[in-house]
Amino acid sequence: MGNINNSEAYVSFQNVQKTYDGESFVIKNLNLDAERGEFLTMLGPSGSGKTTCLLMLAGFETATYGEIVLDGTSINNVPPHKRNIGMVFQNYALFPHLTVNENLAFPLQVRKMAKNEIEDRVKNALEMVQLGDFGSRRPMQLSGGQQQRVAVARALVFEPKIVLMDEPLGALDKHLREQMQYEIKELHEKLEVTIVYVTHDQSEALTMSNRIAVFDDGVIQQLAAPNVLYEAPENAFVAQFIGENNTLSGKVTDIDKEICTVEVGDGKESLRALVVNIDGIGSNTMISLRPERVVVNPESGSYPNVVSAEVIELIYLGDHIRSRMKVCGHDDFIVKIPNSAHHAQLQPGNSVKVGWMAEDARALDALEST
């Protein structure tokens, strides 16, 4: 799945399993490595195991089996306060009775640093998050975004080996959340600190990460760079979870090297798709196709897949039109159409042709409902 070599790993989960009741496992034989300076995101729905992994790395949960290694040393039996790990939570966890300066000074005082060094580090950390003039304020006198910047600065001020972030932007509004994504990414690139980030928000993961581990049911479904996850999902779960996606269920009738033929719509249409994760001829499959890969009324002979479609809904979004169509019996087929004069006359109820390349359609494992 793109794991780095263990000899290069800065953080390493080695055959880690976790159970709370001794029977059902919330983490199942996890092997995951992160490089020094990497921004690695654990992405998945609620209950997928991503937060449990983060808590085990932080020391707030213990692995039932397996080993967790940080900078070449096993930390299974190292208490949280001795792991030299910074943490940023969704609820900020700032001390309300202390000023911003005092909040940042606290982890340094615990480490018994000299007063002048504490003052220098606090000053530098606040300037780093553009809050140099806010040191005398208390958390309640700050906006949500400012509080989150303070939380990030506090996690970095003692120069930890690694920073863990658990849904840190979940409490912010959409605009501020997007702004903080870029600020955290910029800080990471500037400081080259190792960050392990947990979220269920795919846009956060795609925006900030070097690599993303997609979790489901305690198992990593795919580990890859953001563009690879989006363009080349390895299974149906990843295809559905990352980005907007059209799915067409069918049966494989032929395989020719890297391209297979799939019957869909009760055998009324035969489509060609890239072989990715199928069980062979006669097996059920799910074709995954991104909306932006579909062309409306393509030129004759230009696409191997061309089918009839009925326009159901059109939504104007400025630079493009989002159209919901009925295709191969599915009335939730989405097409992103460039906003041009050529397509300006489309109306609900229109009959059109839609086409796409075989390489843009990925034949994956069938969903459980098929």
Residue spans for each PLM region:
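ABC ATPase nucleotide-binding domains
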Residues: P80-G86, Q90, L94-Q240
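Non-catalytic connector elements of ABC transporters
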Residues: N245, D254-T370
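Helix-to-loop junction immediately C-terminal to a conserved catalytic motif
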Residues: A58
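Conserved ABC transporter NBD signature motif
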Residues: G66-S74
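The feature captures the beta-strand-to-loop junction immediately N-terminal to the Walker
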Residues: L43-P45
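Conserved coupling/switch loops of ABC nucleotide-binding domains, chiefly the family-specific signature
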Residues: T64-E67, E117, D217, S249
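ABC ATPase nucleotide-binding domain
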Residues: S12, D33, V69, K353-G355
